[in-house]
Structures are given as structure tokens and as C-alpha cells.
Amino acid sequence: MHQHRRTSSAVASPVSSPHPSSSRPITRDRGTARFGPNVSRGLGIDRQMDASDQEQTIESPEKSPSQKLDQIIQNYHTKAALVILHSRVDLSPATYHGVIRTNKWFNVEVNETEDLKDSLGVWKYSNCTDSRPPPLIIEVYLDLTQLTNNQSLVIIDDSGKRWDVVEALATYGCLDNSRTSKSGVILERWRIDLGPGPDDLPLDMGSILPTVYKKSIVVFRSLYAYSKLLPAWKYSKRHSKIRPNPALSLKYRILQGPGGQIRSTNDPLTVPLHPGNGPVVDTYSFGVTDSPAGPLSALVTYRTNCDFRVDDSEALLSSRFMGVDERFFKPSLPSEDNFAAAGQEHGSLPVQKRDVGRPDLGQAYGSMSTFHQVGATTGASPISALRAARELAAGSPSSPTRPSHSPRPSQAGRVAALSGEGNHLIQRRPSISIQPFKAPPLSASPALVDSPVGSQPKNSAPRVGPMDITSSARQMPPPHGTPTTSRRSAHVSESAIASSTSGSPRPAPISKYSSSFSHRRGRLSSGGASKTDDDNNSSGRVSVSSSTVHPGSGTSADPATTSSGSLQADEDNISDFLKMLEMGKDLLSRKDSKSLDKNTKRTSAALSRFQKMRDSNAVLSDSMSSSLLLQPSSISSSKQLPNAATSVAGASISVSSSPGKAISPHTQHIPAVPSRLSSNSVVDYSHSHEDRHERRHRLSHESRRSPSEERANDEPRLKRDESTANAIDIPTSPRPFIPSFRRSSSAAQRRSSPPVEDDLGDFLPFGMRSLSLGAEDRSTLSLSELVRQQESSVPASDTNALQQQNQKDTRTGQSIVDESPSRIDNVPGTSSPRQYQPRFAHGRGRGSFGHPQPHVSAASSLGRASPIPNVTDADREGYIGSGNNGGTAVPPDTRRGSSHRFSFNRHLGTPANMDEDEPLLFAMSDFGASRRSLEEGRKGATTAGADHGGAPSTELQPAAETRSEGGPPSVSRGRYRAWP
């Protein structure tokens, strides 16, 4: 790049050469001497020159100014060709004695090559007077002749679409069928030109030539740099790193001016190869350098897009058949409605072809885990589908901007929404359908889509499904019995069921969404949980408070209550999550039953049936959970009754320490059930339904046994009751307003089962009683019970008078048989444990207790009792005055405080409704209607005396009573007379 310092040496005789540049005259002209040493380095033409010629001294023969001008013009063309082609193609270097020769003209060093000797001969031997050099045209192109029959050269446009280059050139007439005319695709065209000059050369060229040379240095430096910035250079470097197809290798050709170029009607360089708005070619000029022979210029015209590749012709043809490379093969997205931005399943079948009408969900039938209906299944659980159908039929207000769309089942196959965008037409999978049994039936219907984010229980069918929402979707290993928190909330028409931690193995909650709320699951709740908790912590049961639209349920919901600004263009996953939460608010509004049509009523009835079945499953789980949670606390906080000979049915009953709350069907209770590990602290569920008939039959014969014989028979029975306790009594579905109605209750309100009722009936003079009932609704005392009660305290002289009074009442009255349950007084919360005692003293050595404490605790855990058994005269003789309270009388005003009538009932015969004699676990506030219906039916029943020798019951009113010192009141002789 720098001029070499010349050293003086002996004058060497010039070597004869036919070329005019072979002789260098010796001159001291500084202007001409500067060009002398470099004249012999031109494209390897002077191969005969010795290496010593390169260090020729000033004393060599001097050239004329015209010869120096010819050298500048010749090297201007040849050096430009070397710079351009060295950056595009690989040229073989020229060597001399094993040394690569370098061309240093215009202070730019490039390697000499023998490849351009013949192509550049015209410009090497030209001069500015006799043979002016023609314009030098250099074209860089792609050779199409290198393509095979099954290959096509294509160009990729800015949008990534492929275009056939040969077809584009043929369209503009640049190619014909002859093989020789397929010159290729021109990428660049360089033009080096010497413009026209004066007829006569100026006389002072010696001072002008150094300026021309210096200006040319600037031009060649620009040419060297700019040639490496054009698209063709980038293309060549990209394909030089790999083994390219021969058709993709850059080729060049050197042409002489316009007259020497073979071209067709249209210029192949400017023909557009693909449609587009941008320019096809661009031009850059390196400026003009003035010289005595004329202006020297360099110009390049190049294609702006050089992204070429070779593809298989068959693949390119197939692409055209499919819509010219997906031009007409677009996803089936709606373009005429407001849901164009929402994600939808892509496929070759249009949406209209895949439309499936929604079947009538009200006509569907099946079990809790199967759902049979006409049409394709939507993957919904029965409860969620019925609930959604009822809510839609109720006429929820719809959004003014978006109509409610009917659901369409998603197609199992291609993933519906790869980015997790929600759509009203495509729903996510629901929570686990109800499985009341350990193993699901074989007909369990799988859902069509999956979630994302979450795990899948082992008993659920596999799902073909989309990926996740904002995270990679994947099948995670199912949980193995992980205890989780079950949450459920109360429906408007049902009382709340308290939630608790489940102690039984249960599938882990399925997370519908990967959100920041996932760490909040696992909390206990005393009441109904929110809908969000229910959805995020579902443990396998469909909750009452679940949203109207269950993901994947196939039932669309009304988006009226969603936020107004995110209904149309919101494609975010979190917005869909919030929309689903807002849609659930429709469940909080009460519906007018008059507005529901006939189909809606059938749907509601089916929904109620499923909800009752759900409660049976829920009560079992909650009871087991509560028994584990409440077992340690019940021992320390409750009052334990002695488990001795005076214990009730061989089990101790815990008494609540938090009285004062009325019993109501809408009261929340903490569930508790007996356990094998806690038989000493909870009521025993030990007797079956068949034992109840045996005990009732045995009651009629107990009056004829002696007290000692009766005690001997009771002891083994009590031991048997303790040893044969069942672990869990699974409750049945709730049936309102019948004696066998059972529901989940708190630990303090858990009542004994019917077998316990029979055992307590041995000494308790009354059955279960609803606290909400008034005293005036109590049943009257039967005659046989009054006889036994009074004979225990009335002397023999007064017995005859009482019997005569009873016989008189028998002729005029009728016995009233009351099998409905009644309630006993609360066990007083004293520090020492007490056994349960009847209100009035009677036989079998059990004293009465009658604390003057009214019924104030609705949460007290009290046992239910049946009517008292028959007592013989022998029992009465040794019985008078016995008991804890010494046979004292009980004032009637201490019993519920509002009535002087005592509630005694007795019926030793088999009741008419034996299938419905199971007592309530807790009394209901609205039991009055059922009570009155039972009273009406009681009038037509046979009297107890007709079957067992008793007399018809007669209502008696209490007379004066006495109170013994140190004990509660008791009934004394002659305290009862016929009620007027």
C-alpha cells in the first residue's frame, strides 16, 4: 500500500519486449519516475521480466507522458476487475518462482491471477489515441444450467414466500427454450468506462498525471469497501460456509460495452422475480475521475434481494396446489364477527361444517359419573351441565355487544389453542366428575380437552388436550392419595356444610390455572368457601358453588357480568380466568319459579337428585375428617359420662360446652362420627335395624320380669353393645320432613342412632323432641304409663279410685300413639359427670332428675330416648322412693317453662311406619307441619291397650306437688287427675 523507496543501482540494460511498457527510459523527472517501478506488475503479462526490474533506478529509460497515461487507463480497468471478482468468486493466484505476485496499483493490494488474462486482454493493450478501451462490463449471476430436472431455483420474498425464478424470467421473455439462452439470474452488473476525450492531448500532462493517480486511489479504496457491502457479497459468504448446490454458486462474465452484450428484449437484471412494492434493483456510482484522455467512471447496478435457494420441483408444485404456498390455505378464523381475535382450532374443515347442535340437557339421564344424552358428548359432569342448563334457562341478562353462543364440542386431534387463548366456543376441561364409588364405572365419559397446567387423577379418563395457558402443557404424574383440603359452599336453597381437612386418601386438587393464587390452597374454612376456593381446591366432587360455565363442560355462559372493557379483544389468559369467576355470580341471584318453563323444572328436579347423592358422599368424607380433628379435643373439653352399669347403651355421650344457639336446618355444624379409636367419647352406632323389632317385642315382656332378672339381662347386652360397635354409619341421602331424615351435624349436635333410641327407651319416658315445638303440641300421657307411674307412689287405698277414673276415661276417650321423636332436657353442665335420667321416677331403680334448668342449649349433645318400658307391680314395690333424688316430685313449670302438660307417650305395638321410624339426628324448626300430619294419622291408630293390655291414654293435669329437701321435685301420690 506504500511506495517503496528506490535505491540507486547500476543501470541495467533493458530487456527487449514487444510491449511498449517493457522499456523504461532513464529520466530524472520526478513525475514520471514515480510510475516506473510498478509498471511491470500488471496481471502477470510481463512474465519475461526479471525480478531485478522491479527495483529499477531512476536512470532507467524514461517514458513519455502519453505512455504513462496509457498505463493509468489500462490498470484502472484491470485493477477494478480484480477487486470486484476477488470479493465474489475464488480466483487462482499467479505465482513467480513459488511466490504469489501482488498487484499494488492505486495503493490497494490484491493477488494477481492468471484466470483473467484472456478476458482482460482487450483493456490491457489499449491506448488513448489509436484503440480506446471499450466499457468493461462485469456481470455476477447464477447459472440456471446447473439445475437438474427435478430442481427449481426459487427466491424468498420478505414474507417468506417462495417464487420460481425461471418462471418469472420466462414470463418477461428473458429466456427461451434453447439451453444456451439460459444465461442465469444476474445479481450485479459493474461498468468501468472511459468517457470521450479531446482529440488532442494537452502538452502539460506531466503535471496532470500525478493528480489523476491520487484521485484514482480514493476511487479504488471506495470500490474495495463497497463491494463487500452489497447483497451479492453476503450471499456468497453465506453459501461459502457450506457445500452449496452448483446452481447456487456465483458465476461471472466480462463483457465489452453495450455492443458486445447479448441481451434479449428485456434486461434480465431489472426483471422482477416476485411481486413487491420495493425496488428490484439499485444503482451506486463511485464518481468520475477526470483524465487527459477522458473521464473515468465506475458504476454498479445490483439486485436488492439475493435470497435464492434450490427446492424440489415436486414440492414446489404441491405448494401451488395447496393454494400457492398457503396463500389461500388459511386457518378457519371468523372474519365477520367480533371473535376474530380469539383463538380457535385450526383445521381444513370450516367452522360451519363442524357445528353440532346442543342436545336437551333436561332429557339427559345417567348416574353421577356417566351422562347419556343425544348427540356428541361435551365432557361435562352431570351436575355442572344441569346447573348450567338451569341458569341459562332462567334468562340471565346477556351482553349488549356479544350474543351468547351455543357450545360446540372440540375436536380431539390438533391442539386447539397453542397460546392458551380462551374462547367462548372452546372450553377447558372441567373439575373431576362425582365418583361416589371407589372405582368408576366403565361407561365414564372422558372429557375432550385437557388443562393446563395441571395433574390428572388416576380414576379419570385420559384427555386429548391443549396445552397450557402461558406455560408448557404436560402430563404430570397423578397424585397418590395426598390428603388435601376439600372446600364447598352452600347453595341458596341448602344449608351450609362446614369444610374440613379430609383424613381419607383423596386425589390432589387439579389446578386449572397456573396463577399466583396456587399457594393459598389448603386452608380450613368454617363455612361455605368461595367459588374461587372451590375451583382451585376441588378434591373430586363437583361443588355447588362452581361457576355456571365449567371449563370443558360444553355449556357456554352469559358474559354479562364480566368486565366491560375486556370482552372483545382480550386474548390474555388471566382475563379469561377472571371472566369465569365473574360469570359465577349468577348463582347468587334467586330465580322466580314462575318464570321457569316445564323443561327447566325437570332440569331442577334432576339437579336436586344429584345434589342429594352428592351430600351423602360429602357427609361421609367430612365426618371422617371431623372425627380425626375433634377426637383429641372432645376428650378434654366434653363431659364424659361414666361407662359403667348405669351408662347409656354402653357409650358415653359428650356434652357441648357452647350452648345457647337454636337448632335450625340452616345452622352450620361441625361433623363428627364414631370411630373405633374413639368409642369412649362418641355415641355408639352398634345396632342394626333388625334389632329394633326384637327390642320392641322384648319391651312387652319386661314388665313381667323381676328387677334382679332384668339387671342380669341388661349387663351382657351392654357389654355386647360396647364390643360390636360399627366404625362408620354411612348416612343416606337427605329426605326432608320424615323421621329418617339425616344430615351432617356438628360434634356437639351429633345424635345417637335408632338403636340407641331403643336402649334409652328402657328408662327415658319420652322420645326425641324438637326444641322449636311448643309445649302445647306435646303428646298426652298414655293410660298405662300413668297407672304405673301413680301406682309406684299411690297407696293401695287410692289405687282403686285411680283405676276407676281411668276406666271412665277409657270409655270416652281414645289413646293417642305418638311415634314422633321428642327431646329431653339438656344435661346440666356440672363439673361431675351424670347419667341420663328421666323426668319422673319409675321402676328399675333409676331415679329421676329434674333440674330447674330450661332448654337453652341447641348445641347440647343429648341422646334420644324411647317411651318407658312396662313395669310390673313387683318392680314398683321395691322401687318407690329409690333413685338419685329420693323420689321427690318434679314441678311441671321446670319443664320447658311454658306448659303444665307432661309429654309421655307409649306404644308397644309395631308402628305403622316401621320404615320411617329412624329418628332425626337433629330436630328441624319447621317440623310442625309434619307433626300435625302425624297427629291426624294417630287418631285412626289402634290403642296401645288393645294390643298389650293397657288402657287408652288420658290427658291429666298436675295437682299440688311437694318438694323434698335436697332433691328435685317428684310426683307424689294422687298428683294427676283427668284433664277436663
From Swiss-Prot:
Annotated InterPro entries: ATG13 (IPR040182), Atg13_N (IPR018731), HORMA_dom_sf (IPR036570)
Keyword annotations: Autophagy, Cytoplasm, Protein transport, Transport
Residue ranges, compositional bias (Polar residues): 54-68, 553-567, 786-817
Disulfide bonding pattern of the chain: none
GO CC term (a single one): cytosol
Location of the protein in the cell: Cytoplasm; Preautophagosomal structure
Ranges of biased composition (kind: Basic and acidic residues): 700-723
A GO biological-process term: piecemeal microautophagy of the nucleus
Quaternary context: Interacts with ATG1 to form the ATG1-ATG13 kinase complex.
Entry's family note: Belongs to the ATG13 family. Fungi subfamily.
Protein name per the record: Autophagy-related protein 13
Organism: Coccidioides immitis (strain RS) (Valley fever fungus)
